[in-house]
């Protein structure tokens, strides 16, 4: 019964849970380190994507073409802001080049997929999968650097309440996306249903952790130098 209830309010979890950390971030915008601002913008883009998806779906306007275009634009633009957030802490001098490489590959993949499949058939699936793999790599890289920093107190750093849930969330979503895009749904319908249930629950608690992390943010703190 609990599982059925959670499935029945799927749209509530996915559409509204992300608004919690975003609104907290907007409220505390001037009080938190500017290094976290790209992450707040990333959450805002997620809110916009979920709101548009929900509005289009309820009005019968979410056609495959519209849905795939929305997925592509979100994967690309949200990825750019998430990369900027990561590299503000990674202290890399090449992050603009990496953002450019990310953009070029996303659009190149889209162009190839569109050329091969056409407007009616392309799904932006390769872009979604590529962006997740790309982001997972740099999220993991920053986590490893933070862990190896001798003076970092993990349990007191709000940054870890963003990076760790985000890493597991992206890995989970990557697996789910690959199964959805590249397998026969009829053969693994039960598995996909269970994964979706897990996605709903984890998605909600991830955004709660993001909210806690934002509340812990303090101004002008260099998390790599303390």
Each PLM stretch: what is its role?
Residues 2-226:
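Terminal, non-globular segments
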């Amino acid at each position: 019964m609990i599982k059925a209830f959670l499935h029945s309010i799927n749209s509530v979890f996915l559409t509204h849970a992300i608004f919690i950390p975003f609104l907290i971030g907007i409220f505390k915008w001037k009080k938190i380190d500017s290094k976290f601002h790209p992450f707040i913008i990333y959450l805002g883009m997620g809110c916009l994507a979920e709101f548009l998806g929900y509005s289009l779906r309820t009005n019968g306007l979410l056609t495959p073409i519209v849905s795939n275009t929305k997925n592509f634009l979100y994967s690309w633009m949200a990825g750019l802001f998430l990369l900027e957030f990561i590299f503000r802490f990674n202290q890399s001098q090449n992050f603009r080049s990496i953002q450019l490489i990310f953009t070029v590959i996303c659009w190149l993949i889209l162009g190839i997929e569109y050329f091969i499949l056409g407007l009616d058939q392309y799904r932006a699936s390769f872009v979604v999968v590529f962006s997740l793999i790309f982001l997972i790599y740099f999220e993991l890289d920053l986590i490893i650097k933070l862990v190896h920093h001798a003076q970092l107190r993990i349990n007191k750093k709000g940054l870890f309440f963003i990076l760790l849930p985000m890493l597991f969330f992206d890995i989970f979503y990557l697996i789910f996306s690959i199964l959805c895009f590249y397998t026969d749904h009829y053969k693994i319908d039960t598995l996909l249903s269970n994964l979706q249930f897990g996605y709903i629950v984890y998605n909600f608690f991830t955004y709660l952790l993001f909210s806690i992390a934002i509340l812990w943010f303090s101004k002008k703190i260099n998390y790599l130098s303390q």
